[in-house]
From Swiss-Prot:
PANTHER family: 3-OCTAPRENYL-4-HYDROXYBENZOATE CARBOXY-LYASE-RELATED, FERULIC ACID DECARBOXYLASE 1. This is Uncharacterized protein jhp_0985. One of its GO terms (biological process) is ubiquinone biosynthetic process. Signal peptide: none annotated. Belongs to the UbiD family. GO terms for cellular component: cytosol. Pfam families: UbiD (PF01977), UbiD_C (PF20696), UbiD_N (PF20695). One of its GO terms (molecular function) is 3-octaprenyl-4-hydroxybenzoate carboxy-lyase activity.
Length: 616
């Protein structure tokens, strides 16, 4: 990792923070704000992490690195090769064609020979590792961060979690948050769809303790590989070897039968008793909301090893944009060829970071026949982690670049019709809070591949439309229309909820189809109608398509307000991840925050911003 830091420093991608900062909130808050700066800000190396304990200050001799993945330039420096070249190699690997001549035969042989790098190579443990075992183990000796005020404690956030099947034939590398309970116990937040969870059930059925090893640091590519959505049974270190074109070198663990990369900075080893679960959380997650307290497995730590000059790698997740934007971009680009094997007419896809990946995806396809887009929708919803996508919008090959925000939105709105909107139900991410049931909820697929027959509405200005609608729905506060020149303008309406569901009250507006097309209701107290970036983030987070959509002849009403019992939503509705103002003021006093108010207004760092009438 230190070689990578030298590279970051050389390219002006690293900021070193020598000011002592607390592992509780201060470090994470500063990294959170840095990641929201233009182009992802800098990677931050905190050289003096501290923890206040019983009126004393504990200092750590281990620096903390954050926002390491948080820019396109840092991704390029990490990969050492253009992402486009990696994508082409993946494409070639997945589509071997029969050779037409001797030269092509030689090329195929070379490509096959290059695959020798995918298998990890066993090596001895480095002799200079410092090792603590049994009673010497103390997780509090690591600068583990508490990232959010309402978190249940400190969490390891960039741990590479190594597991294997009961018969040792399958190995897995994943990345899950890990809550520190005490000096030798960690909570393992793996969800129902993770490979390690499948292994866990094998061990539980056999009534055998499950070995787990957690590595931190080393080559940062290990960490990204831990997040890669590979098919079940394919070991993520094989992907590492494919990208690096060299074998991952793995060393044996001391207290369990697993192996981890020998260059990692920190290794935590132990076993999980599959019959014991402990409450884990809450935790401010990548959705920008806190996930609730739930029972999860617990790792009993037997051994901790680390380098003399080890660096603790961490991240902070919450409201976008953050460094997971860039990690997700690499996933999106590299796995396009793999996704195309399931959907051959797929040209491109895009996961906007304010859709927090599983909440929104845009896809461009070669449309060949009627309902082709709906066929691809079902293909997406049946493939790996794509099955957790809540909202998918499909456009034709003549559509603009998917990342050209205004152009692609206008294209979609010209082609949208309620007849080509498919509302379905299926598995969803366990972190989704809007679904009525855990890990299962509504899905919305929109076929915007061809021109709509929906007539253009008769436009009113915002003030005239507001007066008209307030007469029929008194809890409307303000509204703003977006893309009024299109066939399907979007009217965002802020409301104050009282004693009835918004969808029920929206029926009072069905008589205004002449002026309305897509209508989205949001909470007045927590939404700035002039901030479309944060509006989209809240909207796709807060809806369940089966419950929260009402349609009429030409109108499409969406309730993106917070839900409760009046909406027949009986699960706890979470709070947003907001920075502590006390911590922010402390960071300001230390001279570490600049342009905070601008970023706060833009990305709702400390609280949600509502709109005043004079602002519209």
């Amino acid at each position: 990792m230190r070689d990578f830091l030298k590279l970051l420093k050389k390219h002006d991608e690293l900021k070193i923070i020598d000011t002592p900062l607390e592992v509780d909130l201060e470090i994470a808050h500063l990294a959170y704000i840095e990641a929201k700066k233009p182009n992802g800000g800098k990677a931050l190396l905190f050289t003096q992490p501290i923890r206040k304990e019983h009126n004393q200050i504990k200092t750590f001799g281990m620096p903390v690195l954050m926002n390491a993945f948080g820019s396109f330039k840092r991704l390029d420096l990490l990969l050492k090769t253009p992402i486009e070249d990696l994508q082409q190699r993946m494409q070639a690997f997945l589509h071997f064609d029969a050779p037409k001549n001797f030269t092509e035969s030689l090329k195929i042989l070379k490509d096959l020979w290059d695959l020798r790098h995918v298998f990890p190579k066993k090596t001895a443990r480095p002799k200079d590792l410092i090792t603590k075992q049994d009673k010497e183990v103390n997780l509090w000796d690591l600068p583990v961060l508490k990232t959010w005020e309402k978190d249940g404690g400190a969490f390891i956030t960039m741990g590479q979690v190594y597991t294997q099947s009961l018969d040792h034939k399958k190995k897995n590398l994943g990345m899950y948050r890990l809550q520190v309970y005490d000096k030798n116990h960690l909570g393992l937040h793996w969800q129902i769809h993770k490979d390690s969870q499948l292994f866990f059930h094998e061990y539980a059925k056999a009534k055998v303790k499950m070995p787990i090893s957690i590595a931190i640091g080393g080559d940062l590519l290990y960490t990204w590989c831990a997040t890669a959505p590979l098919p079940y049974g394919i070991y993520e270190l094989m992907l590492y070897g494919f990208i690096r074109e060299k074998k991952a070198r793995v060393m044996p663990c001391l207290s369990n039968p697993l192996s981890v990369p020998s260059d990692c900075d920190i290794v935590i080893e132990g076993f999980v008793d599959c019959e014991k679960l402990e409450l884990e959380g809450p935790f401010g997650d990548h959705t920008g909301y806190y996930t609730p307290i739930e029972p999860y497995p617990v790792l009993e730590v037997k051994t901790i090893s680390y380098k003399k000059d080890s660096i603790y790698l961490a991240t902070v997740v919450g409201k976008p944009p953050l460094e997971d934007k860039y990690m997700g971009y690499l996933t999106e680009r590299l796995f396009l060829p793999l996704l195309q094997t399931h959907a051959p007419n797929l040209i491109d896809y895009y996961m906007p970071e304010n859709g927090v990946f599983h909440n929104l995806i845009l896809a461009k396809i070669h449309t060949r026949y009627n309902a082709h887009a709906k066929q691809v929708m079902h293909a997406f919803w049946g493939v790996g982690q794509m099955s957790f996508v809540k909202h998918a919008i499909f456009v034709n090959e003549d559509a603009p670049n998917l990342r050209d925000t205004n152009a692609i939105i206008e294209y979609i709105l010209e082609n949208f019709s309620k007849e080509n909107a498919l509302i379905s139900q299926g598995v969803c991410d366990a972190l989704d809070h809007a679904s009525p049931e855990y890990a299962m909820g509504g899905k919305l697929g929109i076929d915007a591949t061809s021109k709509s027959n929906t007539p253009y509405p008769t436009l009113l200005n915002d003030n005239a439309l507001l007066a008209l609608l307030q007469d029929k729905m008194q809890n409307i506060v303000l509204l703003k229309q977006y893309y009024p020149h299109t066939r399907n303008p979007i009217c965002v309406i802020s409301v104050e909820k009282k004693d009835k569901s918004v969808i029920e009250l929206a029926k009072n507006l069905l008589g205004f189809e002449e002026h309305l097309r897509i209508v989205i209701f949001v909470e007045h107290a927590s939404n700035d109608l002039n901030n479309p970036y944060m509006l989209l983030w809240r909207i796709v987070n807060n809806i369940d398509a089966k419950r929260d959509i009402l349609t009429s002849k030409h109108c499409f009403f969406i309730d993106a307000t917070n839900k409760g019992v009046m909406d027949k939503h009986f699960r706890e509705w979470p709070t947003e991840t907001n920075c502590s103002m006390e911590v922010i003021e402390n960071l300001k006093k230390k001279g570490l925050l600049k342009d905070f108010e601008t970023l706060n207004q833009k990305f709702h760092l400390t609280h949600s911003f509502s709109t005043h009438k004079e602002d519209l």
